[in-house]
Amino acid sequence: MAVDDTAGTLDREEGSTEAGGLEAEEVQARVGLSYTVTQIRRDPTALVGLAIIIVTTTVAIVATVDAVFLEYWLAETFWYHPLRGPHADTNLPPYGVSNQYYDASRTTLSHPLGTDFRGRDVAVRLFYGTRIAITVGFVSTTLGLVGGTLTGAVAGYYGGWIDDVLMRAVEILYAIPFLILVIAFVVAFDPDRKNALLFAMIGVGIASMPTFARLIRSRVFSVREEEYVEAAKAAGVKDRWIILRHVIPNSFAPVLVQATLQIGVAILIVAGLSFLGYGAQPPTASWGQMLNNARNLMLTNQWFSIFPGICIMITVIGFNMLGDGLRDAADPRIQN
């Protein structure tokens, strides 16, 4: 009887130890999240970046709802259709600005940023181009994040030949220049460029996988030795659940920072691809495509290239500012 009581006591102690380890893990995660949020709130640079992201994402959501579900009802009711024209004279400069074709008196507040070579309102096309930029940034980064995180986590957790095979493949991918890899992917899988934007997003996601894989792998090497991972193994939890529920969440902080920065990179890369003709195709309203349309007018009407360039710059800087703030908050050694 005494032996049974002793065994029961030991079982309860082991169970409480394991539960305590998992509870401590959860508490640590919550404390880390609370600390990060507090640091972000104290960082004006990160707050400015967050504000830019909120504004651009809101604009993208409104534009997407109108384009996909309302078939541009909002655009035609309150502004102009972003794909069809002409709405006014072609190549009209911004309000109050003159060029060699038009005097400033010909400009109008109805088209505050002017019109393009087809007479379409530039401001409206900039507004609806936001949805392409934000969609590209989030979708391509999510693809790279998921693929790279799973690859790096599996390689770091198992080690040995699995690590060697996976990381050699990652290094081969990493050795190919980013832009060349994406262009080659688009040309190989969509030579007619009917779905060039879709394949550009997938290509950017694949090209960004090595960055995430290498980053999380280095973290997994230390996390896999933690007590809560050993406790889960002793409890008979399968490896895939240990990786998904314990290893990845506790290795994710630097990956989240990199993902924020990668969104800005993806927006910039796909805008460049659209400019080169390997991204969004006419008449899609995208910032890169607008730069492509303006390439022959940079000497006579430079505004056509300045406005989409400013939109790209502000959006990319916003994600970079927030990413820098997250990095500073995630690494106490950087704090003053």
Segments predicted by a language model, with ranges:
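Non-cytoplasmic
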Residues: I180-A184, A188, M201, G205, ...
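Generic hydrophobic transmembrane alpha-helix motif, especially the helices
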Residues: P112, D116, A133, L143-S222, ...
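Short helix-to-coil transition segments within interhelical loops
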Residues: T115-D116, R120, Y157-Y158, L173, ...
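Gly/Trp-centered helix-boundary motif
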Residues: M1-L145, T149, L179, A266, ...
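Short hydrophobic alpha-helical segments within the ABC transporter permease transmembrane module
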Residues: R125-F127, A169, I216, R224, ...
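Short coil/turn motifs that cap or connect alpha-helices
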Residues: L150, G160-W161, K238-D239, S251, ...
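Transmembrane alpha-helices
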Residues: R131-G147, R240-G272, F319
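Transmembrane helix boundary and interhelical loop/hinge segments in multi-pass membrane proteins
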Residues: S218-Y228, L326-R333
